[in-house]
């Protein structure tokens, strides 16, 4: 029985799908005006893990992760770069897809772009206006009337009085209430615009997800996810829009992953501790980064530090070391009655407890090192695959470069190993030791065995 921590109920609840055997999931994706940072990576990896677990349990999964390709930040960045919004967003969408693929994130069922669903957004805004839950302002904007939706604040646990007391921003004179939020923004010179019943303009951010979620998943679906920073106001506003428009529940389970911190400080550009996925992948293998993300429970804070990635690399090394030496070519059906598989399932069914699931893999690796049975290795790979891990050939994993230094490309390493073998055959041990030391200084570890010398690159030894 799967239990999910529902942010709306503030407790773990048994997952009961709206339709038996099917699950519909919507996750807020990127606003594409820059490269993915570690926070984006965490959202992508966490909910990739979630959908993989549902599929492993034979659910028919419809997974939607949107792309926000029209937004104030996008417009501002395009103006700064003196490029079109279309060129800017296309560039960063491609970069996002490359980063996601590197991290082993499977493509969602649907990845809608906001600009392709403006008609859906206009239609929903019209419903809200007709129901007196929204009002056109004199400047051409349309606002949601928060006080007219009785359930506002139920996701965040905030009352309207508390929210008003904490309001510090300059109040827009066109709003009836400081808490009202924009659904439609009147056109400004040089900005993209669409025709609407309220004049030309563009949609607000919050209405985008309500409209796209409904388009692909219906008015009522199972799970909505995203980062903890979106719980308020974005997700709170989505509930107000969708439930206000349709008069019934919008989503049954709300999931929020925790914040990312860097060296125990909030990640931010102003603190100079802001890293893109590409910057991190220049120093650490993609699978190490994925392992690092899943090593923490998705609701816990994720603290990034070089030493944490280095430790994750060493831990992943131990798992791959157990897989070395015995080839398993066929995928196996997981026997959930197996003691290790049963423990793994119990961990994952407890609100996707990946740290406990990984602990099972380490126990299984210990067993594999003792037995060397293909059956155990196949099970280890299959369980790892549920998390998107351990699918590489172990030898290739260990030989992946952690830098682009051509002096130690695989061909060069093999050449040096042959030179070392010749030196040893000639009893020139000084030269053999010199070559080993040279390779060690390049983070390349040699392993001499009965079948010859193999090598691997030490993971996680570079720093940002």
From Swiss-Prot:
Residue ranges annotated as motif 'HIGH' region: 30-40
A GO BP entry: cysteinyl-tRNA aminoacylation
HAMAP family: Cys_tRNA_synth
Entry EC no(s): 6.1.1.16
Protein name: Cysteine--tRNA ligase
UniProt keyword list: Aminoacyl-tRNA synthetase, ATP-binding, Cytoplasm, Ligase, Metal-binding, Nucleotide-binding, Protein biosynthesis, Zinc
Keyword ATP-binding: yes
Binding site for ATP: 269
Family: Belongs to the class-I aminoacyl-tRNA synthetase family.
Species name: Nitrosospira multiformis (strain ATCC 25196 / NCIMB 11849 / C 71)
One Pfam family recorded for the sequence: tRNA-synt_1e
Gene name of the record: cysS
Motif ('KMSKS' region): 266-270
Catalyses which reaction(s): tRNA(Cys) + L-cysteine + ATP = L-cysteinyl-tRNA(Cys) + AMP + diphosphate
Top-level enzyme category: ligase
UniProt: Zn(2+) binding residues: 28, 209, 234, 238
């Amino acid at each position: 029985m799967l239990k999910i921590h529902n942010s709306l109920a503030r407790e773990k609840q048994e997952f009961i799908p709206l339709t038996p055997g099917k699950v519909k999931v919507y996750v807020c994706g990127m606003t594409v005006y820059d490269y993915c940072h570690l926070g984006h990576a965490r959202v992508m990896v966490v909910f990739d893990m979630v959908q993989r677990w549902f599929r492993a349990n034979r659910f028919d999964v419809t997974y939607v992760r949107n792309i926000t390709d029209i937004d104030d930040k996008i417009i501002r960045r395009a103006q700064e770069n003196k490029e079109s919004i279309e060129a800017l967003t296309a560039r960063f969408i491609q970069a996002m897809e490359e980063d996601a693929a590197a991290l082993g994130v499977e493509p969602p069922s649907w990845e809608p772009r906001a600009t392709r669903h403006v008609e859906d957004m206009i239609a929903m805004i019209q419903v809200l206006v007709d129901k007196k839950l929204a009002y056109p302002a004199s400047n051409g904007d349309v606002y949601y009337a928060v006080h007219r939706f009785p359930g506002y604040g139920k996701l965040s646990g905030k009352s309207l009085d508390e929210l008003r007391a904490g309001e510090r921003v300059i109040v827009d004179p066109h709003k009836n209430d400081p808490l009202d939020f924009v659904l439609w923004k009147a056109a400004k010179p040089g900005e993209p615009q669409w025709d609407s019943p309220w004049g030309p303009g563009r949609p607000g951010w919050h209405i985008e997800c309500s409209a796209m979620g409904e388009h692909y998943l219906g008015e009522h679906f199972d799970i909505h996810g995203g980062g903890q920073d979106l719980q308020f106001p974005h997700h709170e506003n989505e509930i107000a829009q969708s439930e206000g428009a349709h008069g019934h529940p919008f989503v049954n389970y709300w999931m929020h992953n925790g914040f990312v911190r860097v060296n125990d400080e909030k990640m931010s550009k102003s603190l100079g501790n802001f890293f893109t996925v590409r910057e991190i992948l220049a120093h650490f293998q993609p699978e190490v980064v994925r392992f690092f993300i899943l090593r923490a429970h998705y609701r816990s804070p994720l603290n990034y530090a070089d030493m944490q990635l280095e430790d994750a690399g060493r831990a992943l090394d131990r798992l791959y070391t157990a897989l070395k030496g015995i080839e398993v070519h066929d995928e196996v059906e997981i026997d959930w009655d197996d003691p290790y598989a049963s423990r793994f399932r119990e961990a994952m069914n407890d609100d996707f407890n990946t740290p406990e699931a990984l602990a099972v893999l380490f126990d299984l690796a210990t067993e594999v090192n003792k037995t060397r049975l293909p059956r155990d290795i196949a099970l280890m790979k299959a369980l790892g695959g549920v998390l998107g891990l351990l699918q590489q050939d172990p030898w290739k994993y260990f030989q992946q470069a952690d830098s682009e230094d051509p002096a130690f490309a695989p061909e060069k390493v093999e050449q040096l190993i042959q030179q070392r073998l010749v030196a040893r055959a000639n009893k020139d041990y000084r030269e053999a030791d010199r070559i080993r030391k040279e390779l060690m200084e390049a983070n390349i570890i040699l392993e001499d065995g009965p079948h010859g010398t193999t090598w691997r690159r030490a993971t996680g030894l570079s720093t940002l």
